[in-house]
């Protein structure tokens, strides 16, 4: 499995890459769920658990990459006329990404629970008491012990073996990695929430500026219209005055000419 590194800032390509990654995350989550369903069955092997870990880490990397792409998409330059359409597109991608992440985190939690149950069984069968280190407080936030509500595994009278120790260490390492990855997904959820809030503020500011500019243009047009009307009235008044003066001069001319005659 592999994931694609960063791409250019073309909006169409970036949106396509985000959609493609979201689809991959959804498909990988379904594949992880199918693998989880095989645990505890005759198909459960170390190779299967290794495959599960690889699928989970690959999907986690896809989620981080998609988070980065969505951030880039939100800050691409755009014109005011394109801004609303860009926001609608981004909101749709964020909603789809959130749904895919929610499903992925669900199977992550299931995987962590299965690993803990496995370690608990190995410890019980090997007469090893206790759970996990006291400082592993993060695990308590994500993993619930189903064994607390189920009958305890019968303890067998045998000492712990090197194979048991190796299995316990491997599974504990896998649990720590799973819970670190779950924390990564939680951080992505926080990023998505912040991006939605910031994007909304930017859109509101741009729309307010556009509306303000439209008001100023309308006011300027009104002022120009009033000035044009005033100019037309002034010209009309001037023409009337000139006409009156001409008529007056003609009348005076005839009066003077009549007196001379």
Curated annotation (Swiss-Prot):
Residues 47-68 form a coiled coil. InterPro entries: SNARE, Syntaxin, Syntaxin/epimorphin_CS, Syntaxin_N, T_SNARE_dom. The modification N-acetylserine is found at residue 2. GO terms for molecular function: chloride channel inhibitor activity; protein-containing complex binding; SNAP receptor activity; SNARE binding; syntaxin binding. Keywords: Acetylation, Coiled coil, Endosome, Membrane, Phosphoprotein, Transmembrane, Transmembrane helix. The modification Phosphoserine is found at residues 125-126, 129, 205. Detected in all tissues tested. Highest expression is found in kidney followed by lung, spleen, heart and brain. Lower expression, in skeletal muscle, liver and testis. The modification Phosphothreonine is found at residues 4, 79. The keyword Phosphoprotein applies. It comes from the Eukaryota. SMART domains: SynN, t_SNARE. GO terms for biological process: endosome to lysosome transport; intracellular protein transport; organelle assembly; organelle localization; positive regulation of receptor localization to synapse; positive regulation of T cell mediated cytotoxicity; regulation of protein localization to plasma membrane; synaptic vesicle exocytosis. The chain crosses the membrane at residues 239-259. It is found in: Early endosome membrane. Interacts with VPS11, VPS16 and VPS18. Interacts with VPS33A. Forms a SNARE complex with VTI1B, STX8 and VAMP8 which functions in the homotypic fusion of late endosomes. Component of the SNARE complex composed of STX7, STX8, VAMP7 and VTI1B that is required for heterotypic fusion of late endosomes with lysosomes. Interacts with TPC1. May be involved in protein trafficking from the plasma membrane to the early endosome (EE) as well as in homotypic fusion of endocytic organelles. Mediates the endocytic trafficking from early endosomes to late endosomes and lysosomes. This is Syntaxin-7. It comes from Rattus norvegicus (Rat). The lineage of its organism: Eukaryota, Metazoa, Chordata, Craniata, Vertebrata. The gene is Stx7.
């Amino acid at each position: 499995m592999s994931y694609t590194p960063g791409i250019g800032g073309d909006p169409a390509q970036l949106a396509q890459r985000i959609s493609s990654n979201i689809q991959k995350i959804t498909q990988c989550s379904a594949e992880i769920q199918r693998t989880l369903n095989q645990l505890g069955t005759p198909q459960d092997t170390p190779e299967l658990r290794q495959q599960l870990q690889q699928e989970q880490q690959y999907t986690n990397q896809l989620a981080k990459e998609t988070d980065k792409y969505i951030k880039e998409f939100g800050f691409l330059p755009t014109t005011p006329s394109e801004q609303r359409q860009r926001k609608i597109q981004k909101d749709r991608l964020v909603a789809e990404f959130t749904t895919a992440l929610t499903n992925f985190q669900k199977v992550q939690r299931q995987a962590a629970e299965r690993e803990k149950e496995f370690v608990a069984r190995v410890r019980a069968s090997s007469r090893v008491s206790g759970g996990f280190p006291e400082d592993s407080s993060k695990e308590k936030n994500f993993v619930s012990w189903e064994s607390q509500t189920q009958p305890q595994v019968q303890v067998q009278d045998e000492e712990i073996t090197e194979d048991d120790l190796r299995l316990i260490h491997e599974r504990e390492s896998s649990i720590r990695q799973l819970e670190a990855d779950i924390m990564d997904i939680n951080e992505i959820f926080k990023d998505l929430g912040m991006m939605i809030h910031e994007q909304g503020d930017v859109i509101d500011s741009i729309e307010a500026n556009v509306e303000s500019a439209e008001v100023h243009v309308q006011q300027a047009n009104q002022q120009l219209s009033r000035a044009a009307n005033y100019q037309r009235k002034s010209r009309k008044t001037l023409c009337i005055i000139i006409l009156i003066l001409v008529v007056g001069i003609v009348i005076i001319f005839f009066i003077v000419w009549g007196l001379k005659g």
